[in-house]
Swiss-Prot record:
It holds the Pfam family Med31. The gene is MED31. It comes from Homo sapiens (Human). This is Mediator of RNA polymerase II transcription subunit 31. GO terms for molecular function: transcription coregulator activity; ubiquitin protein ligase activity. It is found in: Nucleus. The keyword Ligase does not apply. The modification N-acetylalanine is found at A2. Belongs to the Mediator complex subunit 31 family.
Length: 131
């Protein structure tokens, strides 16, 4: 009986840990949040830097499939470099990253729409030629 309760507690704890780490990793996609962390000295804390290194397991497909903001993995990778962590103290750096993300999404959206239109046209041609 006690073993079953302990397993349930472990499962609940693991589920909570997974959710917290998932949420935190996704927050790393926000350059303003990174600037906030840098200005408060989190990136100077060796334990915090080690935690960021530990979080690299999110790059594995087994975990990455749960991410809504894949750019957080790129930020997590960049945070492994001390120079990048130091630059984030500067609000202009965070603003630049934010602008680059917006440009990427705009380009990605346009490219994706064109691809979807081309696929729809191709399917329509296949349907009309197949009849």
């Amino acid at each position: 009986m006690a073993a079953a309760v302990a397993m349930e507690t472990d499962d609940a704890g693991n589920r909570l840990r997974f959710q917290l780490e998932l949420e935190f990793v996704q927050c790393l996609a926000n350059p303003n949040y990174l600037n906030f962390l840098a200005q408060r000295g989190y990136f100077k804390d060796k334990a915090f830097v080690n935690y960021l290194k530990y979080l690299l397991y999110w790059k594995d497909p087994e975990y990455a499939k749960y991410l809504k903001y894949p750019q957080c993995l790129h930020m997590l990778e960049l945070l492994q470099y001390e120079h990048f962590r130091k630059e984030l103290v500067n609000a202009q750096c965070a603003k630049f990253i934010d602008e680059q993300q917006i440009l990427h999404w705009q380009h990605y959206s346009r490219k994706r729409m064109r691809l979807q239109q081309a696929l729809a046209e191709q399917q329509q041609q296949n349907n009309t030629s197949g009849k």
